[in-house]
A protein has these predicted regions:
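Multi-pass alpha-helical transmembrane bundle typical of ion/small-solute transporters
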Residues: 1-240
Length: 240
């Protein structure tokens, strides 16, 4: 009995670790996407608050998706809807970039309302979760384990998104890299729903996302570089 109980506990622990690892790996591209959504908000306080409220709603939607996962996977239309939503976000971002307002300074943030961003966060996370939730359900049939992994995944996502919000201000190409990542996830989701055998393996998608992130972090903002330089000069003068 003791050995049986110990074996069951080890099995549960390993399954939970697998779910947490799965959620963590799948959170990186999701996090940078959510960070890009809140970046237009005018203050860091509003950005953090929008992430908090948006992910609370997202957690509710994730749980609803988990509870109905066996039903949802029967309908490819859900994946198509999620894919089209992600592709719409990307198209909207680059369309606005191609049509700047002459009266708006080139580096200024577009106006977005706090309550407009929250549903965008929730539905974007839901679209990203369509793939990961079905994978998590395949790992184990213990619902409480999947829910625990889901909760840990949202906490991890919140932490990573907070980091990316700061990095989006520091690195010039990171926002475009974020939306190109959303584009790749949207295409994968669309292909999986329409023609699953043509979808590339996960490692190729991961490699592409890694390349996009590398490009995104390749150039720092000129303003931040100049600020760093001016902060170093007085220290050097003092040492001299």
């Amino acid at each position: 009995m003791t050995d049986l109980g110990l074996g069951s506990s080890i099995d549960i622990g390993l399954t939970l670790m697998a779910l947490v690892a799965l959620e963590t790996v799948l959170s990186a591209d999701n996090a940078v996407a959510l960070a890009a959504l809140v970046q237009p908000l005018p203050t860091p306080q509003q950005q953090q608050k929008a992430l908090n409220w948006g992910l609370v709603v997202a957690l509710v939607l994730r749980i609803a998706l988990l509870l109905t996962a066996t039903w949802v996977v029967q309908f490819w239309q859900f994946q198509v809807a999620g894919a089209l939503y992600l592709l719409w976000l990307v198209g909207k971002h680059f369309w606005l970039q191609l049509q700047p307002d002459p009266a708006t300074p080139p580096n200024s943030k577009p106006s977005s309302t706090f309550w407009h961003i929250i549903p965008l966060i929730a539905f974007t996370d839901l679209a990203f979760s369509l793939d990961s939730v079905t994978t998590a359900v395949a790992v184990t049939d213990r619902l409480w384990l999947v829910l625990t992994g889901c909760l840990i995944g949202v906490v991890t996502l919140r932490f990573l998104a907070g980091l990316f919000v700061r990095w989006l201000e520091e690195f010039v190409y990171l926002q475009d890299a974020a939306y190109l990542t959303i584009f790749s996830v949207g295409l994968k989701l669309l292909g999986k729903a329409i023609q699953p055998e043509l979808v590339p393996p996960d490692w190729t998608v991961l490699a592409m996302v890694t390349i996009l992130f590398t490009w995104g972090f390749s150039k720092r903002s000129v303003e931040l570089v100049s600020e760093d330089a001016t902060s170093i000069v007085p220290e050097q003068m003092h040492l001299d």
